[in-house]
Swiss-Prot record:
Specifically methylates guanosine-37 in various tRNAs. GO terms for cellular component: cytosol. It is an enzyme of class 2 (transferase). The gene is trmD. This is tRNA (guanine-N(1)-)-methyltransferase. Homodimer. Its EC number is 2.1.1.228. Transmembrane segments: none annotated. S-adenosyl-L-methionine binds at residues 113, 133-138. The lineage of its organism: Bacteria, Pseudomonadati, Pseudomonadota, Gammaproteobacteria, Vibrionales. PANTHER family: TRNA (GUANINE-N(1)-)-METHYLTRANSFERASE. Keywords: Cytoplasm, Methyltransferase, S-adenosyl-L-methionine, Transferase, tRNA processing. Its main location: cytoplasm. It comes from Vibrio parahaemolyticus serotype O3:K6 (strain RIMD 2210633). GO terms for biological process: tRNA N1-guanine methylation. Pfam families: tRNA_m1G_MT.
């Protein structure tokens, strides 16, 4: 996958290209990330990238010319058909379904806003989709862009050592993930559930599914409203609720 990024602070993306799973993906050639700074497309000695909004009001907007030139240059550098995304509080909220949709694209161009945002005409003429990571405001689109890159890259074949990790994570099937345990067997008098050491794969699968359903019911019950549970899932959830209420 190729990802282009338009940002006034391209150095921030070293945390994506140099570290962790995404850094390994870059080294393996599975993920390519290129950045363009609108400041490099300015024509004045101050390298100005902000401008006053028409109608007055507080704050500034990103200057049209440097931003637009950066976008056009990035589009030309893309290896193929590219989906252009503007990270914005007004965009569609990113969730697991959205991540999986975005992961089907071979090329993405992410525009990171700053100040009070960008000229609406840039969005209308250059942007395919707007995406948000939540109902809150940040100082810029860089961290949302890094969040999007990190989550989408997990679905690139070969990025994760075991692709099942992406398929079994929280939200992958509409549910929160089940609890996980590693050594030691006893930690501060708390023992690993015996079923996980039983070697019975059927029992382990059912335990994990039951815990996943129960954790979703406890912490994010609204997620269950949108799911059509199987008979097995209905039974396991009922058992979890009964056991929980009996405590």
């Amino acid at each position: 996958m190729w990802v282009g990024v338009i940002s006034l602070f391209p150095e921030m993306f070293r945390s994506v290209t140099d570290f962790g799973v995404t850094g390994q993906a870059v080294k393996k050639g599975l993920l390519s990330i290129e950045t363009w700074n609108p400041r490099d497309f300015t024509h004045d000695k101050h390298r100005t990238v902000d401008d006053r909004p028409y109608g007055g009001g507080p704050g500034m907007l990103m200057m049209v010319q440097p931003l637009r030139d950066a976008i056009h240059t990035a589009k030309k550098a893309s290896p193929g058909k590219t989906k252009v995304i503007y990270l914005s509080p007004q965009g569609r909220k990113l969730d697991q379904k959205g991540v999986e949709e975005l992961a089907t694209n071979e090329n993405l161009l992410l525009i990171c806003g700053r100040y009070e945002g960008v000229d609406e005409r840039i969005i209308q003429s250059e942007v395919d989709e707007e995406w948000s990571i939540g109902d809150f405001v940040m100082t810029g689109g860089e961290i949302p862009a890094m969040t999007l890159i990190d989550s989408v890259s997990r679905f690139i074949p070969g990025v994760l050592g075991d692709f099942a990790s992406a398929e079994e994570d929280s939200f992958a099937n509409g549910l929160l993930d089940c609890p996980h345990y590693t050594r030691p067997e006893v930690l501060d008098d708390k023992e690993v559930p015996s079923v996980l050491m039983s070697g019975n794969h059927k029992d382990i699968r059912q335990w994990r599914l039951k815990q996943s359903l129960g954790r979703t019911w406890l912490r994010r019950p609204e997620l269950l409203e949108n799911l059509a549970l199987t008979d097995e899932q209905e039974q396991l959830l009922a058992e979890f609720i009964s056991e929980h209420n009996a405590k």
